[in-house]
Regions:
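Polybasic low-complexity intrinsically disordered regions
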Residues: 1-92, 96-105
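Helix-centered, glycine/charged polyanion-binding patches within enzymatic domains
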Residues: 87, 92-158
């Protein structure tokens, strides 16, 4: 099987209000939001990071929310307990030889990432891999545009987590409606027409 992994920033409030934000401060500090940096948008933000793993068809198989300051590579430690004997394709945020070796030795998971230009043993990116990876980017775009996943008015951490889970569930239901009606799974905007 082949899967694609990526992450998306979920902003809780603006960076200037980050120190005054009360979300996650009352209870478990391990779930409190944190400051992070999004390399693709070249911005700092205060909140969480949504990690998702999807298949070739575009259905999300696994997801997790972590603090914004946590590196993308840490999500792969959770994946190795759930999946085995598969290939996972990620972006440059998932480069790490020790993690790739650990995933392969423990669960026979091949983690494929494009090389950085200044990396030793550089090889060009395999074009079909780059085209297929657009699937998870499309899912994140659909979550942002049609389900407004980045706009959240939750006051507590559990409320935010529940809203994110609800939006991912709604996306999956619309994909299933398209599957039943023999329509392309990715066209969720017109699923109920």
């Amino acid at each position: 099987e082949q899967f694609f992994v990526d992450s998306k920033p979920i902003e809780v409030c603006r960076v200037a209000r980050g120190k005054r934000c009360k979300m996650g401060r009352a209870g478990n500090f391990s779930q409190a939001p944190d400051f992070g940096f999004c390399a693709s948008q070249n911005t700092y933000y205060f909140g969480y990071k949504l990690h998702a793993l999807c298949g070739l068809s575009g259905v999300i198989h696994s997801y997790d929310l972590s603090k914004a300051s946590v590196a993308d590579l840490h999500y792969m430690k959770d994946v190795k307990h759930t999946y085995h004997d598969c290939s996972i394709y990620g972006d440059k945020g998932y480069i790490g030889a020790d993690v790739q070796l650990d995933l392969f030795e423990t669960a026979h998971i091949r983690l494929e990432c494009p090389y950085r230009l200044n990396q030793k043993d550089w090889k060009p990116t395999f074009i079909p891999f780059a085209k297929a990876r657009k699937r998870i980017e499309t899912i994140f775009s659909q979550l942002t545009d049609q389900f407004l996943v980045i706009r959240n008015y939750a006051k507590i951490t559990n409320g935010l987590f529940a809203r994110i889970i609800g939006k991912i569930s709604a996306l999956t239901i619309l994909q299933y409606v398209n599957f039943i009606n023999d329509k392309p799974i990715g066209r969720i905007k017109y699923a109920l027409n």
